[in-house]
From Swiss-Prot:
Organism: Thermosynechococcus vestitus (strain NIES-2133 / IAM M-273 / BP-1)
General function of this protein: PsaD can form complexes with ferredoxin and ferredoxin-oxidoreductase in photosystem I (PS I) reaction center.
Entry similarity comment: Belongs to the PsaD family.
Residue numbers spanned by region Disordered: 113-139
The protein's name: Photosystem I reaction center subunit II
Bias (Polar residues) ranges: 116-130
Gene Ontology biological-process annotations: photosynthesis
Keywords associated with the record: Photosynthesis, Photosystem I
Pfam families linked to this entry: PsaD
This protein's record includes keyword Transmembrane helix: no
Protein origin, superkingdom: Bacteria
Entry keyword annotation includes Magnesium: no
One CC-aspect GO term: photosystem I reaction center
């Protein structure tokens, strides 16, 4: 079981209604390290001040964690965030990045999906492929 560490940002509002559903179902947490104290917008409305060092925020939905990461952390060049699912029994599971490397980064051993081994300039003309049974995305 993973123990999450970090301090919550300075925030005067709510985190989108964890309420009692999080105790009976699941909740999500996002952790990141900030190089300095700075203001950011919460995905559940309002603004908060992330603290220098490790930060930890709980949300009711995974999408709220992803929104915070994509819209607030990445533009600030904070790329060490991790998203966890926390079950009612206390079990914590890392859900993003699943294998420790973000999806858009190259990871040795990760197979390319929907990859065509050519540049855009080498794509065939679709009008020449019409009625041949070949698709423009075929290698």
């Amino acid at each position: 079981m993973t123990t999450l560490t970090g301090q919550p940002p300075l925030y005067g509002g709510s985190t989108g209604g964890l309420l009692s559903a999080a105790d009976t179902e699941e909740k999500y947490a996002i952790t990141w390290t900030s190089p300095k104290e700075q203001v950011f917008e919460m995905p559940t409305a309002g603004a908060a001040v992330m603290r220098e060092g490790e930060n930890l925020v709980y949300f009711a939905r995974k999408e709220q964690c992803l929104a915070l990461a994509a819209q607030q952390l990445r533009p600030r060049k904070i790329n060490d965030y991790k998203i966890y699912r926390i079950f009612p029994d206390g079990e914590t599971v890392l859900i993003h990045p699943k294998d420790g490397v973000f999806p858009e980064k190259v990871n040795k051993g990760r197979e390319a999906v929907n990859s065509v081994p050519r540049s855009i300039g080498q794509n065939p003309n679709p009008s020449q492929l019409k009625f041949t049974g070949k698709k423009p995305y075929d290698p």
